[in-house]
């Protein structure tokens, strides 16, 4: 049956109320092509119906027989209904004032940043800035982040964010293992490091043979460790002078990592000045809500000598084709997509949006504003200390920035009860102690409530705050020897935008430089840049989700946990697995967790020797990097001429490693954009040799509702919630089969446990990036089972339409039976380079002149473009992209035929900035109009790249990763 145009339905009368109720209206907003457009595209492909196309694309042997079993979410909700249902869950959470600390603090998000960054699609729908010319705004904001971190830590260079403080500390451990003394495999963790950090470090250390020791900081120098982790200030609040200890560790041949509070560093001597080699931490308290644990931007800063070993993104300064300053991601050869199992990290997605928020918090407040906030926090902590001492309590720590640990003896339970009555959370620091960590949001009234609680338990009257304040010396709790004297945030960007008008215009100027989904399609293969709907994003900023501490008592987080349970069951239904964990806070972390689960399974069966991971040659670089992190040996399986796993080679290698085979990692549909016909056979071969099947969920957007990895042989997968399930570039996974469910990650340090057999924590918070999980919940609730399947089918339709239209101009490298692809296609530009000298990079840069972000370049095959349009793009937008690609092919043909010079042509000089096109001198043989307006549609809506082509080689040769002086832009 053909799809019927909605106008025909509307003309039928009478219509009932049931027919007029718009429960599935969201699906029509999310799915770009309407019924008429879909039929036109199907006609182009030679299919009568969408169902017929899907039957031809997906192997019948793996098709899902039943509708997605979504239970109460099978029927779609309208946007209003879904928001109301989620609001009901959010209202079950109790927003207490949390003084728990432990790395998480309440904070004020400046409204100008909330509205113009966090809630602005120009910022949250953008992709990783691999195409620098159309990412200058985000790159500048991230460069500000790097400058902020480097200044505050006192170290030479910082990266552009990591996932959370605990994983950043684990990354620092492996960094120091690479550069440290070879005779040691010991990493020493001081006993006042945050407990969740220690647990993540232990998880990371075990599979790679690092021995983690923990004890008093004073014993660190004698531990013969290649690295030592210190907390500054300590978890209990102490501010210790570690200068002599750092010298002793260095003298013993070790290196020092410091986990430092970013706000405290505005008033405390930075770790780089007292001996730290690496600093890590969390920037959450710089304006990013707690969000039940995330997402937040962690940081890492290092001494200059370690910059090429540092994991994560690194923004650097270079010049463009006209010699003007331009920003780009530097030293990319360190990253997993290039170095694979030899990479320094498997970090694929950094916390860019949250890093931008934190950097803008510093820009808005400036050095003086930040110091004022820090001094106010410290003053409130000092007044609290004075008050409780007046009431007869003793503090464990005499020095502190914002945290007190208090001896409360037999009054402890009573104190917690009094606090609960005032809707206050104190840290449970044992049976006879409580902890209190104050923050930017703590007011005089809050301080009065805290003092009243301690007074009640003591049977006394709370002291007067003004009297305490009058009798208190300036900054009595900060050791004078550790007072910060060095300047920070001296660059003009941190000293100019302090009025809201200036800040608003600065943010607008940056977002105008970038190309995000709010301007045009981002057809990146393997990235699924689909709609992040506004109604999905709205709940992220609700205080009932944002102001919840990750270690808040369970009775305060009922709504969160109910929502998470529902989302886990939704994902179980979509994947065909038995259980899902949402703790991993990135796809790469999901991979890593999944492989650790596989290892735990083998270990439970007395087969811990199984450590070989088979990985197809076409795999994404995170696969071998994650396998290496999980302590596995990578054995590459060949692919055949059609891009499929070579079955003969797989059989040979599975047989050769039958005794020690742990797993195979496959992507489905394949990284080549094809539903491999023999995926069941692949799974059966590996299972026959005792291995487990890891199905990379990066391409789940081609499977939802149509097939499921848990049903065709997969044992474990990670899910990229930021791809298939609409979270802006974020994280997800893993899902596992029934025999692996008991091994899903725990977080024992905070009391979160799925079972005694679970692996250790892989993220700092029990539920990872919890505050963005409502996005996926909303998406699934508003789509329902039928429309989720329709979205998958439309993604496949859109990809095949592009492949069909472009095939006469660019060969489609891989396809399945009937010449069909899955949800993405690979265009082969290698013959073009041979015939014209035009490279895939030239085409990518030229697309910017047409107003498009390039498809994925040279992955998985060098010299190709991988195109993934997603279901969210309309036929009109697809046709605009197709027209641009055809026009570019015509420009290439002009070079091939000698009508255009091989060097002086619009592709080689792309992209063209407004400054270049309007300059007095025009040195090119082609016209200004051809440079800037190659198609007529650009006249009405033109995006101008802010810089010319970035010089990558210059940037890496002359590495500079700090803010650029204004004079350089003159």
Curated annotation (Swiss-Prot):
Disulfide bonds: none annotated. It comes from Burkholderia pseudomallei (strain 1106a). Keywords: Oxidoreductase, Pyridoxal phosphate. Belongs to the GcvP family. This is Glycine dehydrogenase (decarboxylating). Its EC number is 1.4.4.2. It comes from the Bacteria. The glycine cleavage system is composed of four proteins: P, T, L and H. The glycine cleavage system catalyzes the degradation of glycine. The P protein binds the alpha-amino group of glycine through its pyridoxal phosphate cofactor; CO(2) is released and the remaining methylamine moiety is then transferred to the lipoamide cofactor of the H protein. It is an enzyme of class 1 (oxidoreductase). HAMAP family: GcvP. Its cofactor is pyridoxal 5'-phosphate. InterPro entries: GcvP, GDC-P_C, GDC-P_N, GDC_P, PyrdxlP-dep_Trfase, PyrdxlP-dep_Trfase_major, PyrdxlP-dep_Trfase_small. One of its GO terms (cellular component) is glycine cleavage complex. GO terms for biological process: glycine decarboxylation via glycine cleavage system. The modification N6-(pyridoxal phosphate)lysine is found at residue 723. One of its GO terms (molecular function) is pyridoxal phosphate binding. The keyword Oxidoreductase applies. It catalyses: N(6)-[(R)-lipoyl]-L-lysyl-[glycine-cleavage complex H protein] + glycine + H(+) = N(6)-[(R)-S(8)-aminomethyldihydrolipoyl]-L-lysyl-[glycine-cleavage complex H protein] + CO2.
